[in-house]
C-alpha cells in the first residue's frame, strides 16, 4: 500500500493541507481562508475555533480529493504562523479569548513598562535571543490573563493552557490528550531560554505567567501523539513533525549546514541563516532563534525580517493602481534600462532590521521630469532586493564568515527580474528549488524522519533540486555604487513621522 505524508500549513490568512509522496511530489493541496478580526486600530485577532475548523476541513478535503484514507498516511507534520497566542480552558477545550495574532500591537504599552525594569531588555536579548517587542507571545499571554474576567484565577488553579497555533492543533487532533510545542515555536515566545532549552523562570515571573499553563517542549521531529481521522476504532495516524513557518522553510530548503541561508519573499521577507550549534548574538538587532531541534539537540539561526517585501507590489496594484496584476511588474521593470536614479523606500510601517526605525516612512526619491511609471515599478521591485542585502550584510557581519548562495522561496521569488537583480546586488548565486512549497515540505520532512519514511537528512538533501539559478552579472564596483545610493534614500526616510 502506498504511503504519504500530510503537511498541515496553518498560515496567517489561510489553512492548507498538502500531501507529499516519498519523492516529494505534491499529490494534492486544499486551502481555506478564514476571517481576520480587527477590533481596534493596531489589533489583530483570529478565532481559534475557525482556525481548527478550516484546518481540519482541508485535511479531510485533500484526502477525499486524492482518494486517500488514513491507512495511507504515514504521518502528519504541522507548520504554523509563529507567535500567535491562544489560551484555552483545560477542562472544556474552549478558548477564553480570540487568538492574538503576531501582527497585533496591543501590548506595546506592556513592553514600554517592561523596558523600565532593571536590566530586563538585556536579559531578554541574552537568554531568549529576541528583542522586547509586542510581536512575541509573552506579553500577549499576560494581556489575556490581565484582561479576560476570571482568567488569572483560573490560571493560578491550573485550569488554563497556553499554546502557539501548533500546540492548539495538536491538542485538537489528539482530543485534548497532548499539550506540546517544539523548540522552534517555543523560541518565539520571549519566555523560553534558548541556552538551557527550558521555560525561563525569570520571564514567567516578570510577566506573571503560571508555569502550569505551558506546553511541554519537544524535538521538531518525534511522535507527539496520534490523530484518529476516521470513525472510532480507526487507524491512528502519528503526528510527528512541528516547526514554525520560517524554520520549516529553512528545513524544507535542505539548509542543514552552518552558513546555509534562505530568504522567503512573502508579504514581508524572512531571511534565516543556519549558525549550527553556535548561538550567535547579533550586533545589528537581528534575532537569535532556534532553527530546529532534533534528538534533544538544537541548531540555531539568525533571523532578519523585512516588513514590506511583496507588499510593495500589492501597493503598486491596489493603491497606486499602476499595474493590474502582480505578475505585470516584471514586464514593466524590463522596459527601462535601469531605475533612472529613482529609489523607493517602502517604509510604510517603519524599517525593520538592521535600521529598527519605527518612525521611518515610505519615500520615493530621485524623480525627474523624465521619470515614468516603469521607473517607479522597477524601483519598487528593487527595494525588496536592497532590503535583503541590508539584512544579509548584517548577518555576515555578525557571524564573521561569508556565504556561497541564497536559497529562495515565496511568491515574489517567481519574479525572475527580481531574482536576477538580487543576485547582482549581493554578488551571490540565488537558487530557486523545484518544489516551492518549502514551508509545508519542511513539516513533511520532519514528520517523515520521525517515522522512518525518510531515513535521514542525507536522504532528504539528495531530493533537493534547483529549478533555476541566477548568477551575478555586474561588477562589485557597480553593485556598491547602487547600494550607496539606496543607503542615501533610506536616510531620507528615517524619523519622518517624529513630531517636530
Curated annotation (Swiss-Prot):
<keyword id="KW-0418">Kinase</keyword>
<feature type="binding site">
    <location>
        <position position="411"/>
    </location>
    <ligand>
        <name>ATP</name>
    </ligand>
</feature>
<dbReference type="InterPro" id="IPR018483">
    <property type="entry name" value="Carb_kinase_FGGY_CS"/>
</dbReference>
<dbReference type="GO" id="GO:0005524">
    <property type="term" value="F:ATP binding"/>
</dbReference>
<dbReference type="InterPro" id="IPR043129">
    <property type="entry name" value="ATPase_NBD"/>
</dbReference>
<dbReference type="Pfam" id="PF00370">
    <property type="entry name" value="FGGY_N"/>
</dbReference>
<comment type="pathway">
    <text>Polyol metabolism; glycerol degradation via glycerol kinase pathway; sn-glycerol 3-phosphate from glycerol: step 1/1.</text>
</comment>
<dbReference type="GO" id="GO:0006072">
    <property type="term" value="P:glycerol-3-phosphate metabolic process"/>
</dbReference>
<feature type="binding site">
    <location>
        <position position="83"/>
    </location>
    <ligand>
        <name>glycerol</name>
    </ligand>
</feature>
<feature type="binding site">
    <location>
        <position position="135"/>
    </location>
    <ligand>
        <name>sn-glycerol 3-phosphate</name>
    </ligand>
</feature>
<feature type="binding site">
    <location>
        <position position="411"/>
    </location>
    <ligand>
        <name>ADP</name>
    </ligand>
</feature>
<feature type="binding site">
    <location>
        <position position="415"/>
    </location>
    <ligand>
        <name>ADP</name>
    </ligand>
</feature>
<keyword id="KW-0067">ATP-binding</keyword>
<feature type="binding site">
    <location>
        <position position="12"/>
    </location>
    <ligand>
        <name>ATP</name>
    </ligand>
</feature>
<feature type="binding site">
    <location>
        <position position="314"/>
    </location>
    <ligand>
        <name>ATP</name>
    </ligand>
</feature>
<feature type="binding site">
    <location>
        <position position="82"/>
    </location>
    <ligand>
        <name>glycerol</name>
    </ligand>
</feature>
<dbReference type="InterPro" id="IPR000577">
    <property type="entry name" value="Carb_kinase_FGGY"/>
</dbReference>
<comment type="subunit">
    <text>Homotetramer and homodimer (in equilibrium).</text>
</comment>
<keyword id="KW-0319">Glycerol metabolism</keyword>
<feature type="binding site">
    <location>
        <position position="310"/>
    </location>
    <ligand>
        <name>ATP</name>
    </ligand>
</feature>
<protein>
    <recommendedName>
        <fullName>Glycerol kinase</fullName>
        <ecNumber>2.7.1.30</ecNumber>
    </recommendedName>
</protein>
<comment type="function">
    <text>Key enzyme in the regulation of glycerol uptake and metabolism. Catalyzes the phosphorylation of glycerol to yield sn-glycerol 3-phosphate.</text>
</comment>
<feature type="binding site">
    <location>
        <position position="16"/>
    </location>
    <ligand>
        <name>ADP</name>
    </ligand>
</feature>
<dbReference type="GO" id="GO:0004370">
    <property type="term" value="F:glycerol kinase activity"/>
</dbReference>
<dbReference type="GO" id="GO:0005829">
    <property type="term" value="C:cytosol"/>
</dbReference>
<dbReference type="GO" id="GO:0006071">
    <property type="term" value="P:glycerol metabolic process"/>
</dbReference>
<feature type="binding site">
    <location>
        <position position="245"/>
    </location>
    <ligand>
        <name>sn-glycerol 3-phosphate</name>
    </ligand>
</feature>
<feature type="binding site">
    <location>
        <position position="267"/>
    </location>
    <ligand>
        <name>ATP</name>
    </ligand>
</feature>
<feature type="binding site">
    <location>
        <position position="246"/>
    </location>
    <ligand>
        <name>glycerol</name>
    </ligand>
</feature>
<dbReference type="Pfam" id="PF02782">
    <property type="entry name" value="FGGY_C"/>
</dbReference>
<feature type="binding site">
    <location>
        <position position="245"/>
    </location>
    <ligand>
        <name>glycerol</name>
    </ligand>
</feature>
<feature type="binding site">
    <location>
        <position position="13"/>
    </location>
    <ligand>
        <name>ATP</name>
    </ligand>
</feature>
<dbReference type="InterPro" id="IPR018485">
    <property type="entry name" value="FGGY_C"/>
</dbReference>
<dbReference type="InterPro" id="IPR018484">
    <property type="entry name" value="FGGY_N"/>
</dbReference>
<dbReference type="GO" id="GO:0019563">
    <property type="term" value="P:glycerol catabolic process"/>
</dbReference>
<feature type="binding site">
    <location>
        <position position="267"/>
    </location>
    <ligand>
        <name>ADP</name>
    </ligand>
</feature>
<feature type="binding site">
    <location>
        <position position="135"/>
    </location>
    <ligand>
        <name>glycerol</name>
    </ligand>
</feature>
<feature type="binding site">
    <location>
        <position position="310"/>
    </location>
    <ligand>
        <name>ADP</name>
    </ligand>
</feature>
<comment type="similarity">
    <text>Belongs to the FGGY kinase family.</text>
</comment>
<feature type="binding site">
    <location>
        <position position="12"/>
    </location>
    <ligand>
        <name>sn-glycerol 3-phosphate</name>
    </ligand>
</feature>
<feature type="binding site">
    <location>
        <position position="82"/>
    </location>
    <ligand>
        <name>sn-glycerol 3-phosphate</name>
    </ligand>
</feature>
<dbReference type="InterPro" id="IPR005999">
    <property type="entry name" value="Glycerol_kin"/>
</dbReference>
Amino acid at each position: 500500500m502506498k504511503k504519504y505524508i500530510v503537511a498541515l500549513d496553518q498560515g496567517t490568512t489561510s489553512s492548507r493541507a498538502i500531501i507529499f509522496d516519498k519523492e516529494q511530489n505534491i499529490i494534492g493541496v486544499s486551502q481555506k481562508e478564514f476571517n481576520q478580526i480587527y477590533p481596534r486600530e493596531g489589533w489583530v485577532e483570529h478565532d481559534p475555533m475557525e482556525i481548527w475548523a478550516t484546518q481540519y476541513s482541508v485535511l479531510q478535503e485533500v484526502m477525499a480529493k486524492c482518494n486517500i484514507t488514513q491507512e495511507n498516511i504515514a504521518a502528519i507534520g504541522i507548520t504554523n504562523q509563529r507567535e500567535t497566542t491562544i489560551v484555552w480552558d483545560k477542562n472544556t477545550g474552549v478558548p477564553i479569548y480570540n487568538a492574538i495574532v503576531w501582527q497585533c500591537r496591543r501590548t506595546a504599552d506592556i513592553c514600554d513598562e517592561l523596558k523600565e525594569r532593571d536590566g530586563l531588555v538585556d536579559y531578554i536579548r541574552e537568554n531568549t535571543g529576541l528583542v522586547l517587542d509586542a510581536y512575541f507571545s509573552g506579553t500577549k499571554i499576560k494581556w489575556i490573563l490581565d484582561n479576560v474576567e476570571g482568567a488569572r484565577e483560573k490560571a493560578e488553579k491550573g485550569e488554563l493552557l497556553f499554546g502557539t497555533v501548533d500546540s492548539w492543533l495538536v491538542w485538537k487532533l489528539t482530543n485534548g490528550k497532548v499539550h506540546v510545542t517544539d523548540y522552534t515555536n517555543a523560541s518565539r515566545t520571549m519566555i523560553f531560554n534558548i541556552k538551557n532549552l527550558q521555560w525561563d523562570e525569570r520571564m514567567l515571573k516578570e510577566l506573571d505567567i503560571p508555569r502550569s499553563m505551558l506546553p511541554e517542549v519537544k524535538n521538531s521531529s518525534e511522535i507527539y501523539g496520534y490523530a484518529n481521522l476516521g470513525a472510532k476504532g480507526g487507524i491512528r495516524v502519528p503526528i510527528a513533525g512541528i516547526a514554525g513557518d520560517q524554520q520549516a522553510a529553512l528545513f524544507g530548503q535542505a539548509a542543514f549546514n552552518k552558513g546555509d541561508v534562505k530568504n522567503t519573499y512573502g508579504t514581508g521577507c524572512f531571511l534565516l541563516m543556519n549558525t549550527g550549534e553556535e548561538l550567535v548574538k547579533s550586533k545589528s538587532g537581528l534575532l537569535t532563534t532556534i532553527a530546529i531541534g532534533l534528538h534533544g539537540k538544537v541548531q540555531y539561526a539568525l533571523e532578519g525580517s523585512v516588513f514590506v517585501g511583496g507588499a510593495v507590489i500589492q501597493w503598486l496594484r491596489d493603491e497606486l493602481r499602476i499595474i493590474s496584476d502582480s505578475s505585470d511588474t516584471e514586464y514593466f521593470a524590463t522596459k527601462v534600462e535601469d531605475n533612472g536614479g529613482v529609489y523607493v523606500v517602502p517604509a510604510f510601517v517603519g524599517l525593520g532590521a538592521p535600521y529598527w526605525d519605527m518612525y521611518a516612512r515610505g519615500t520615493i526619491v530621485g524623480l525627474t521630469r523624465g521619470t515614468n511609471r516603469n521607473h517607479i515599478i522597477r524601483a519598487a521591485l528593487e527595494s525588496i532586493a536592497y532590503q535583503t542585502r541590508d539584512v544579509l550584510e548584517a548577518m555576515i557581519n555578525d557571524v564573521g564568515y561569508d556565504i556561497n548562495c541564497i536559497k529562495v522561496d515565496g511568491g515574489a521569488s517567481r519574479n525572475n527580474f527580481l531574482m536576477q537583480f538580487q543576485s547582482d546586488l549581493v554578488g551571490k548565486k540565488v537558487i530557486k528549488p523545484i518544489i516551492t512549497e518549502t514551508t509545508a515540505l519542511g513539516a513533511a520532512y520532519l514528520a517523515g524522519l520521525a517515522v522512518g519514511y525518510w531515513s535521514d537528512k542525507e536522504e532528504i538533501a539528495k531530493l533537493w533540486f534547483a529549478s533555476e539559478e541566477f548568477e551575478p552579472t555586474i561588477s562589485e564596483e557597480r553593485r556598491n555604487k547602487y547600494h550607496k545610493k539606496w543607503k542615501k534614500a533610506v536616510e531620507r526616510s528615517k524619523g519622518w513621522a517624529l513630531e517636530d
